[in-house]
Amino acid sequence: MYFDPLELLPMIDSNHDVQRWRVLEIEFSAQLEHPDPYRNLELDATFTHESGLKLTMPAFWDGKKSWKVRFAAPELGLWTYTTHCSDALEGGLHLQSGSFDVHAYRGALPLYQHGFLKVSRNKRYLEHADGTPFYWLGDTHWLGLTAKERFDDSNDARFASQFGGIIEKRLEQGYSVWAASLMIGEWNDASGSPTPLW
C-alpha cells in the first residue's frame, strides 16, 4: 500500500525539490469577493512539459479566497503552468503562471518509483507507468472510515490504534490495496442502539 503526504506549496520557487509522481499542491488567492465561489467560479491549470506534453487539472475552492490545484508530474524536466478562470477579471486566479523543475523520486514507495497504474497492453493486468507489473492484493475494510473504527484506542492489545493496527498488519502482509466504505448506512451496536457513522 502506498502512503505519503502531499507536497503542499503556497508558491513554487526554484529552490523547491519537486519529484516525479509526487503530488504537488499550488495555492492561488482570489483578489475579488465572490458570493458563491464553489458554484460560480471554475479554475483550471494547464501544465506543459518541455517536450510539449500538456495536462490540464481542475483547481478546487478551499475556503475564503483560497484555490488550490494538485498535480503529479509524469515526466522529469521543466514544467510550466498557466491558470484559466471562468471570471477573466479575477486577477488572482486568471492567467497566473509559473514553472518548476521535476527531479527523480528518491524514496522507497513503488508508486513513485514506477509511476501511476494503467492497464497493460494486452488488457489483462495492471502495471505501473514504466511497465513494472502491479500485484493487486487487497482488503476491503467496510468500517475503516466510520465511528465504529477506533483511531485513538484499540480492542487489540497489540495496537494503540485499531485503525492503525489494521493498516500496519496489512503492510506487513504485503497488501498493495486497501479499500473502505464511506457510506454504509446505519449500523447498530451490540445493544441494538444505533451509533453514529462518523
Regions found by a protein language model. Give the residues of each.
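Intrinsically disordered, low-complexity boundary segments flanking structured domains
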Residues: 11-14, 44, 121-123
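Intrinsic structural disorder
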Residues: 1-2, 79
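N-terminal start-of-chain detector that recognizes signal peptides
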Residues: 15-19, 150
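Conserved aromatic beta-strand anchor motif in extracellular beta-sandwich/beta-rich domains
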Residues: 47-49
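Active-site-adjacent substrate/metal-binding segments within catalytic domains
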Residues: 54-70, 78-82, 91, 109-198
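Short, compositionally biased P/S/T/A/G/V-rich stretches that sit at domain boundaries
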Residues: 2-15
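Extracellular interdomain linker/stem segments of modular secreted and single-pass surface proteins
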Residues: 103-109
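Ligand-binding face of N-terminal immunoglobulin V-set domains in extracellular IgSF glycoproteins
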Residues: 20-25, 30, 34-44, 55-102
